[in-house]
Amino acid sequence: MKFPGRGSNLLPIVNELGALPGLELQELFTFLILLLIASLRVGAFLISAPFFGSRMVPLQIRIVFSFCLGFWILDTLQFPDQNTLLGPKLILIVLQELFIGLTVGLVLNICFAAVTLAGEKIAATSGLAFASQVDPNGGGQSPVISQIFFLFLIVVFFSVNGHLIILGLIYKSFEFYPLGQFTSYGELVSAGLSASDILFKSAAIIVLPIVIVLLFVNIAIGFITKSAPQLNLFSFGFPMTLIGAFLILFYSVDAIAFAFKDLIQSIIDLVMSLLVEPSDG
């Protein structure tokens, strides 16, 4: 197969590819289009999901990983006919895949924000709000406790294979949201409200026991300073509050880990109802 302009320097690579036996550029172009479409849903998720979409993971790695996953699932997907892929509906298919992947990543971000919110409230109650630094995930300032909680949640998430479960659910979502078949996406929109419910409920479960104990510590410090006025409230109460906060967090590690595990289970159930069982969600 020869291409016009063989002697031209404009398309030497294309001409060399056309000279290879058994290789049609139309087939190569179609394969690249299919690979791109298969990678869009996973790639959009990796860009918007927590940890995967953070600045700690370079964009090039996320793009390569999404194309690798797209190549892996390419043979198992049912694609529309070639005329649909090369027609105006291709734009709608691309937008559909991006919408589904970004929605799943946004849902995970909202749910993962529960530990950040819990850390901010604990830091404000214990006097550790001043101990803040740049958050590598969002780029803004956040308390150190929030960042420790977030890293702890990431460790628990990977330890229970949550990342593999979520990626598996995204793969199964092609059965309920096939390529090129535009159905109702009301479940994807309502998933944000369910994620917000998980956000505040999980944050309250994590925060309330620690904050209540710190409240009793502050009440005890108030009685002590009231009975002994010579004690300075700031020189005595502030260190005692910090020590109490550290002790409470130290002895609450197991309980916090179980709370994080329940949060991850709620996230998996929400994503499952969103992608795999939309009719039951």
Please annotate each region the language model reported.
Residues K2-G281:
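Hydrophobic alpha-helical segments and their helix-loop boundaries in membrane
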